Amino acid sequence: KELDLIDEIKFVHPKDMQDGKIEITSGDITTNLPYVDGVHLAFDHHLSESIRNEKRENHIIIPTAPSAARVVFEYYGGFETFPESFAEMMVAVDKADSAQFLKEDVLEPKGWEFLSFLMDARTGLGRFREFKISNYQLMMDLIDYCKNHTIKEIFALPDVKERVELYEKYAEAAKEQIQRCATQTKNVVVLDLRGEETIYPTNRFMIYALFPTANISIHIL
């Protein structure tokens, strides 16, 4: 959007792309999604996609890149094209897409890390209330807002603030619930929430921060 190359943005599910449910034309650019024939350009960083697909000129894939956003950023010239003010945001995007969070980022999230959790549907905030605008609409708004505002200014937005307040309201209850309902066997932790009247919202990495020797989790709902 910074380069005025797009006129419409859609967020779609990877499985819907694979199943052919999303109409793709030669005027489309896809990012962080499975490759589909007929697309103009497809950007990705998943090794599985480079294995699944034969090499194509319009499939811009760098398996060593920390994020698909980084692949797009470098393809279009990096900081020779984009403003230096994007630097902090790009580091945060790399961290979120590759899940390179520190334990404290997960337990007590702040800044860009916190924003990524708030915007992730898997955090579960939507189960608790109807926000003034949907997560989808907020994502669309933030595409423009993030270009010219600091993370502090982003968190001052009313639509972001109400999500922060809800997350923090249930933060301790969510941690207690995971510790009470989870059992670990070797490197696998099973979270059984079938008997819980309320499933409290928290980021999807919390279970690994609370059970740091586990690297696989199974959720029973």
Model-found features: residue ranges?
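A broad, low-specificity signal for short, low-complexity segments enriched in glycine/proline
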Residues: 149-153, 177-182
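Long, charge-rich alpha-helical interaction segments
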Residues: 121-161
